[in-house]
C-alpha cells in the first residue's frame, strides 16, 4: 500500500489560492520562496448559505411593525482562535441620536432687552440659551460668530442680488427668519455666504442643504415655499462658483421635480408682513420726548407723579418689546467676550444684527428710552439704584453693540472731535470699564450724547422713504427734544 496522503490544515493562503500543496514551513514556505510571492497566513472564513431550495417566501409585515436585528458575526468569529483574541464585543445602544433640527435659542428678558445668550458652535446648535425669569416665548438666534458673519454676507451681498426684481425682497426680509426654523434653508443660506467668501472652495453647508431638501421633499405634507426657496438658493450657490456643475444642477432640478414644484410656486415667497400689534401703541411705547425732559430736569410735577409716569413709560416699553413682530427682533446676538480677553481686536460690546434699518432704529430708540428711565429711577429711588444701574449698563451695552454693526454709521456724523471720539468708543474712561455709566456723570453730558446719537439714527432713516409714516411720530418728538442743537433735516427722511 502506498503512503497515505494528508491535507495541510495550517498551510499558507497563497498556496491554497494556487491550488498546490504547502509544506507549512515557517515563517515562509518553500513554494512562496521559489516564486518570490508573499506568504499570507491566517484564517479565511467562508460563509455558505444553506437550505436555499427550501427557503420560504418573505412574509409581508404591516406598516409600523418594530424590527429588532441581532448581529451574530462577532459570536461566529469568536469561535476561532484568532477571532477570540482580536474581536472585542461592542455594546450597541438602542437609542438613536436626535438630529440637529433647531438652531440655538434664547429667551427675551423680563424688561425686553436683548438676552445675554451664550456663544455656541455649529455642532452645538441644539443648546438652549434662556434668560432668567423670561415670560416670553423662546427666540431662535444665531449665536456663532462664523455663522453670523456668513449671514451678514448673505444679507449684504447675495440677497440684494437675488431680490433685485422683487419689490418685497423675500430673500432679505423673509428667508433669514424662516431659516431659523428650517435647517435646510439655513444651510443653503450659509452655503451662499461661504461661496461668496471662497468661490473656489466646496461648502459643507451645501451638502447638508441638499440632504435636508431631499428629506423635505419626501414628506407627505411638503412645504412647497420652503422647497422653492432652498432650491433657488442652491442654484444661486452653483452659479456663484467658477463653473456651473451640471451634475449638481441636475440634482437640484430633480429634487424640485420630485416635489412637483414649478416657477409659479415662488409666489409663496412674497408675503406682505403685517405688524402683530397696534401701531399707535408701538409708537407710544417709546416716548423719548418725556424721558429726555425728565433727564434734563425740566419735569415740573411732584416726585410721586414722576415715579408713576416712569412706571407707565417703562410698562409701555416692556409692552412694545413683548408685542413687536419677529422681523423687528434680532437675528444674531453674540455676547461680548470676557473682560480678560487678550485679543487686540476684542470688543467690549455684543454683536447684534437686525434685518432692515427700521428694526435697527426702533431697537435703538427702545434702548435709549429704557436707559433714560433707568437713570431716572436710580436717581429717585436709592433702594432700587443697584437694579436700575444694572439695567443702565445692559441697555448701554446693547446700544453700542447695535450701533457698531452699521456700515453707514459714520456718514451722517457732523460732530466735534470729542463727540466723534465718544461715538467711536475710544474715550479713555470708557475703555477701562466697558460701560456707558462713566460717560454719563452729569445730565449735561447725557444730553450732549443724545444730541450726537439721534442724528446718527436719522441718517439711517434716510433710506426708509417708503416707511415714512411709521416714523413720523418719532420725527416730531425728536425734533421737539433736540431743537436747534443737532444738524439734521427731518424733511429729508
UniProtKB/Swiss-Prot annotation:
Transcription factor; part of the gene cluster that mediates the biosynthesis of the meroterpenoids arthripenoids. It comes from the Eukaryota. PROSITE patterns: ZN2_CY6_FUNGAL_1, ZN2_CY6_FUNGAL_2. This is Transcription factor atnE. Its main location: membrane. SMART domains: GAL4. Residues 12-39 bind DNA. Residues 116-129 have a biased composition (Polar residues). It comes from Arthrinium sp. It is a single-pass membrane protein. GO terms for cellular component: membrane; nucleus. It holds the Pfam family Zn_clus. Keywords: DNA-binding, Membrane, Metal-binding, Nucleus, Transcription, Transcription regulation, Transmembrane, Transmembrane helix, Zinc. SUPFAM superfamilies: Zn2/Cys6 DNA-binding domain. One of its GO terms (biological process) is positive regulation of transcription by RNA polymerase II. The lineage of its organism: Eukaryota, Fungi, Dikarya, Ascomycota, Pezizomycotina.
Amino acid at each position: 500500500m502506498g503512503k497515505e496522503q494528508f491535507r495541510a490544515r495550517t498551510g499558507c493562503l497563497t498556496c491554497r489560492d494556487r491550488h498546490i500543496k504547502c509544506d507549512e514551513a515557517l515563517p515562509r514556505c518553500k513554494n512562496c520562496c521559489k516564486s518570490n510571492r508573499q506568504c499570507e497566513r491566517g484564517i479565511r472564513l467562508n460563509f455558505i448559505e444553506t437550505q436555499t431550495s427550501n427557503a420560504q417566501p418573505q412574509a409581508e409585515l404591516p406598516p409600523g411593525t418594530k424590527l429588532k436585528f441581532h448581529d451574530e458575526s462577532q459570536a461566529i468569529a469568536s469561535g476561532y482562535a484568532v477571532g477570540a483574541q482580536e474581536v472585542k464585543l461592542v455594546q450597541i445602544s438602542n437609542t438613536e441620536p436626535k438630529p440637529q433640527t433647531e438652531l440655538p435659542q434664547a429667551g427675551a428678558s423680563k424688561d425686553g432687552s436683548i438676552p445675554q445668550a451664550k456663544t455656541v458652535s455649529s455642532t452645538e446648535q441644539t443648546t438652549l440659551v434662556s434668560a432668567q425669569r423670561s415670560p416670553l416665548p423662546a427666540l431662535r438666534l444665531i449665536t456663532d460668530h462664523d455663522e453670523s458673519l456668513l449671514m451678514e454676507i448673505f444679507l449684504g451681498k447675495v440677497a440684494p442680488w437675488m431680490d433685485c426684481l422683487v419689490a418685497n425682497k423675500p430673500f432679505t426680509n423673509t428667508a433669514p427668519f424662516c431659516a431659523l426654523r428650517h435647517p435646510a434653508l439655513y444651510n443653503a443660506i450659509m452655503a451662499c455666504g461661504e461661496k461668496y467668501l471662497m468661490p473656489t472652495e466646496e461648502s459643507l453647508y451645501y451638502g447638508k442643504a441638499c440632504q435636508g431638501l431631499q428629506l423635505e421633499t419626501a414628506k407627505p405634507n411638503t412645504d412647497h415655499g420652503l422647497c422653492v426657496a432652498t432650491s433657488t438658493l442652491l442654484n444661486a450657490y452653483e452659479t456663484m462658483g467658477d463653473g456651473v456643475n451640471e451634475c449638481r444642477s441636475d440634482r437640484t432640478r430633480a429634487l424640485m421635480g420630485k416635489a412637483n414644484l414649478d416657477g409659479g410656486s415662488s409666489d409663496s415667497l412674497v408675503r406682505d408682513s403685517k405688524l402683530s400689534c397696534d401701531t399707535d401703541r408701538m409708537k407710544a411705547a417709546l416716548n423719548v420726548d418725556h424721558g429726555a425732559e425728565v433727564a434734563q430736569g425740566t419735569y415740573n410735577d411732584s416726585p410721586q407723579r414722576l415715579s408713576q409716569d416712569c412706571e407707565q413709560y417703562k410698562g409701555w416699553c416692556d409692552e412694545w418689546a413683548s408685542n413687536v413682530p419677529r422681523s423687528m427682533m434680532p437675528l444674531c446676538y453674540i455676547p461680548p467676550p470676557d473682560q480678560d480677553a487678550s485679543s487686540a481686536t476684542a470688543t467690549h460690546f455684543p454683536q447684534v444684527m437686525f434685518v432692515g434699518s427700521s428694526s435697527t432704529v426702533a431697537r435703538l430708540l427702545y434702548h435709549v428710552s429704557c436707559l433714560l428711565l433707568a437713570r431716572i429711577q436710580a436717581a429717585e429711588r436709592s433702594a432700587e439704584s443697584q437694579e436700575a444701574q444694572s439695567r443702565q449698563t445692559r441697555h448701554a451695552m446693547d446700544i453700542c453693540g447695535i450701533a457698531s454693526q452699521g456700515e453707514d454709521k459714520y456718514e451722517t456724523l457732523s460732530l466735534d472731535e470729542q463727540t466723534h471720539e465718544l461715538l467711536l468708543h475710544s474715550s479713555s474712561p470708557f475703555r477701562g470699564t466697558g460701560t456707558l455709566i462713566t460717560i454719563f456723570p452729569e445730565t449735561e453730558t447725557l444730553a450732549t450724547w443724545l444730541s450726537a446719537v439721534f442724528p446718527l439714527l436719522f441718517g439711517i432713516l434716510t433710506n426708509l422713504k417708503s416707511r415714512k409714516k411709521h416714523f413720523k411720530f418719532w420725527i416730531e418728538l425728536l425734533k421737539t427734544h433736540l431743537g436747534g442743537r443737532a444738524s439734521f433735516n427731518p424733511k429729508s427722511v
